[in-house]
């Protein structure tokens, strides 16, 4: 990518997300999504190779299809209700089409097949933007229409997403695909609580972005893209050895780390609404998610399956780029649970 074009591309992505999040008119919300999509394609093809080109094409086709469904829903909603405001999606069929379009953009099951493939075909930092920043604009639209969405449809999509994300990551050795399937699972949890408490969805999204950003930065520092490379991190960057397992455990939702907080609050929200079956199913399925994180943690330990690790520690440490925000992110990733009473007061 041309260095002179980078500020324009990233500012367009930022502007598109901001327009969608702050817009109260359906047309401008759609324009913001289109700006965001078109500006993000050069980010995916930062390294020009057939794999990144394939990932960009898959991303474009999926997002363009979702945008077409969204535009159809906007026009039908205007014809039937005469309203252009984003908070007024009163028509049942229009609301259903909007949810389907946003589910495609967010990578929810059964529209999730593009997420692992696109993430795998991009560099680590582009994958970070795909799994974090690119969820803000669709999530803002879902937040605005949360009062008029079909609860049964959202719960069905959420449980399918949790199942697809947890099951799909079991046989993966590529770290980017594992994080992509983890993203599908987290989006399922966010959407499940949206009809009951939209603010809880925002809290879940914030914590998810913190956890995922920390994980990608650690993997980028160690240049690890597979479980085999991750197992050799300890002899290159010894200080990463305790940080990567704790971050992965938090991302998997193991108490008492930060990742357990959103799941705990969401389960509590369901119990307040006298629904015990749905959170039980979600929690049981998510245990599969925690399993493949435990497998990754075993790979970063002293042993390497199925034999002991004979790799010697390097006497000279490798130079790494300074990451001033990483200590703060690691602290938030592991120690945010103790301040949960304050968060409950705010919500």
From Swiss-Prot:
Transmembrane segments: 13-33, 55-75, 96-116, 123-143, 150-170, 178-198, 201-221, 247-267, 277-297, 325-345
Swiss-Prot/TrEMBL GO biological process terms: mitochondrial electron transport, NADH to ubiquinone; mitochondrial respiratory chain complex I assembly
GO molecular function, one term: NADH dehydrogenase (ubiquinone) activity
KW Mitochondrion (keyword) present: yes
Entry's EC annotation: 7.1.1.2
Catalytic activity: a ubiquinone + NADH + 5 H(+)(in) = a ubiquinol + NAD(+) + 4 H(+)(out)
Keyword terms: Electron transport, Membrane, Mitochondrion, Mitochondrion inner membrane, NAD, Respiratory chain, Translocase, Transmembrane, Transmembrane helix, Transport, Ubiquinone
Any one annotated GO CC term: respiratory chain complex I
Bilayer topology term: Multi-pass membrane protein
Keyword Mitochondrion: yes
Subcellular location per the Swiss-Prot or TrEMBL entry: Mitochondrion inner membrane
InterPro entries hit by this protein: Complex_I_Subunit_2, NADH_DH_su2_C, NADH_UbQ_OxRdtase_chain2, ND/Mrp_TM
Record's function text: Core subunit of the mitochondrial membrane respiratory chain NADH dehydrogenase (Complex I) which catalyzes electron transfer from NADH through the respiratory chain, using ubiquinone as an electron acceptor. Essential for the catalytic activity and assembly of complex I.
Subunit structure: Core subunit of respiratory chain NADH dehydrogenase (Complex I) which is composed of 45 different subunits. Interacts with TMEM242.
Family named by the database record: Belongs to the complex I subunit 2 family.
Name of this protein: NADH-ubiquinone oxidoreductase chain 2
